[in-house]
A protein has these predicted regions:
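Membrane-interface "cap" regions at the ends of multi-pass membrane proteins
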Residues: 1-29, 57-62, 66-78, 83-87, ...
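Membrane-embedded translocation segments of transport machinery
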Residues: 2-7, 11, 164, 168-313, ...
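Loop-to-transmembrane helix boundary motifs in multi-pass membrane proteins
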Residues: 6, 12-14, 20, 138-142, ...
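C-terminal membrane-solvent junction of multi-pass transporters and transport-like membrane proteins
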Residues: 88-93, 323, 330-343, 365-427
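Transmembrane helix-loop boundary segments of multi-pass membrane transporters
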Residues: 29-46, 80, 161-170, 245, ...
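Inter-helical loop and helix-membrane interface segments of multi-pass membrane transporters/permeases
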Residues: 2-5, 33-37, 67-91, 104-162, ...
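Helix-loop-helix connectors at the membrane interface of multi-pass transporters/channels
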Residues: 74, 107-135, 236-240, 245, ...
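Transmembrane helix-boundary motif of multi-pass solute transporters/channels
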Residues: 9-49, 228-234, 241-248, 252-255, ...
Length: 433
């Protein structure tokens, strides 16, 4: 049963879910893929998949959490109603913990970059050398510790109250800061080339299977559909909230965040004649080089990394909350003890994988194998083990009009099938998210 209270408002709930969904993938992957796979043409499959996964994927996980009134472990046990059900939820929970461990390392790099900007180290010295030094084994322990200390401190008290308040501040701040960055970047000479890269449609890419594969993977992982994290937020949801509507609002704001990141990043990269890339190199090597060359570069670099830290912290809160809530209920311990134990375990493991190559391999295993399998497990559990009748009853709460047979078809057959495809393609392509 839910021991951590409920979200006080639908706005607070949606912002918390947006906070979970908006993360590194929106910032360092979406802008590059948007340009690389056809510009505006890429948006067609991307928006189709975002709408589909938001409607029937997020809604299903929220509904399961609210119905079971508990998070990952309890929700799977609620559905399966046998001994198997007591253990099956551990895989999605492992995914949440695994991604949190890797995420905390990357957020540690963000915090170290903020420190580097404030101390004038980052932009006045050799940027690749700064990044190399930062990503060595045990080279960033203080900033790494600070990331987990801040996150656990925010989770230490009442779960829903803290999560709601934090996201009501950090998510609007994230959007405001990125809007400011996007406006400033639009004034650069040569920024038009970045807009062309992003938005000039290359319609031939619609006939390229990789465009659809990458759009599907980007949309799926962008919404934090993991069979775990969004279930626990659903457990904190009141019965009068329209879940499908809230799910689509989450998907819309997540897409806006990704577009803002694209508008702030790629025109800046092109205006300074730097080749666009994706992944950590974009955030920690390419963009600092851009900031180094622009007027008031330190100021805008600080803006950027603070914005990224907001997105990262709100995502990490959800990952750790999924674990803490489950441990709190499974082992009958206090919330403070659950948060403390989770924080210590996360820190000990993540410190050992601080090396950039090691954490990269760690994240590959988690995102290519564990998370997609856990998401598939969640989809099957909700649409086939729990069943449509019970799910529909929960989805109809708070709605003026009940969900119809189209929702059932899209969820039970299209969504579950695509979850299988995403798992297979992720392995074949060595990651599509």
């Amino acid at each position: 049963m839910n021991k951590n209270g409920n979200f006080k408002s639908t706005v607070g709930f949606v912002l918390a879910c947006v906070g979970s969904a908006v993360g590194m993938g929106n910032i360092w992957m979406f802008p590059y893929r948007l340009g690389q796979y056809g510009g505006a043409a890429f948006l067609i499959p991307y928006l189709i998949f975002i709408a589909l996964f938001g409607l029937v994927g997020l809604s299903a996980e929220f509904a399961l959490g609210r119905m079971a009134k508990t998070g990952t472990l309890g929700a799977y046990a609620y559905c399966w109603k046998n001994k198997f059900g007591k253990y099956i939820g551990w895989l999605p929970l492992l995914g949440s913990l695994g991604i949190a461990i890797g995420y905390s390392v990357i957020l540690g790099w963000v915090f170290r970059s903020i420190q580097g900007v404030l101390t004038n180290e980052l932009l006045t010295n050799d940027i690749p050398a700064f990044f190399t030094n930062m990503t060595q084994s045990f080279s960033n322990v203080p900033c790494h510790f600070l990331v987990l200390f801040v996150t656990c401190l925010l989770l230490f008290t009442s779960a829903t109250n803290a999560i709601e308040k934090v996201n009501k501040v950090l998510m609007p701040a994230f959007f405001i800061l990125f809007i400011i960055l996007a406006i400033r970047v639009s004034l650069f000479n040569g920024s038009i080339e970045g807009y062309k890269f992003l938005f000039v449609p290359k319609w031939e890419y619609l006939f390229n299977k990789e465009t659809w594969i990458m759009a599907m993977g980007q949309a799926f992982f962008s919404l934090s559909i993991t069979g775990s994290g969004m279930i626990v937020y659903g457990a904190y949801l009141k019965d009068d909230v329209d879940i499908p509507k809230a799910s689509m609002q989450t998907a819309i704001f997540d897409t806006i965040a990704a577009m803002l990141a694209a508008l702030a990043i790629m025109p800046a990269v092109f205006s300074f004649g730097i080749d666009p890339v994706s992944g950590p190199s974009l955030m920690f090597l390419t963009l600092p080089e851009v900031f180094k060359q622009m007027p008031l570069g330190n100021f805008f670099a600080l803006f950027f990394f603070i914005s990224v830290s907001f997105a990262g912290i709100t995502s990490l809160i959800n990952m750790l909350e999924a674990v803490c809530e489950s441990w709190q209920n499974r082992f009958h311990i206090s919330r403070k003890k659950a948060v403390l134990v989770c924080g210590i375990i996360t820190f000990i493991i993540s410190v050992c994988i601080e090396n950039g190559d090691i954490v990269g391999k760690w994240m590959d295993v988690v995102t290519i194998y564990i998370i997609p399998f856990a998401a598939l497990l969640g989809a099957i559990t909700i649409y086939y083990i729990l069943g449509w009748k019970a799910l529909k009853q929960e989805l109809d709460k708070g709605r003026k009009k009940p969900v119809g047979p189209t929702f059932k078809f899209l969820g039970k057959y299209v969504y579950v099938f695509l979850a299988i495809i995403i798992l297979i393609l992720g392995i074949l392509y060595n990651g599509i998210g």
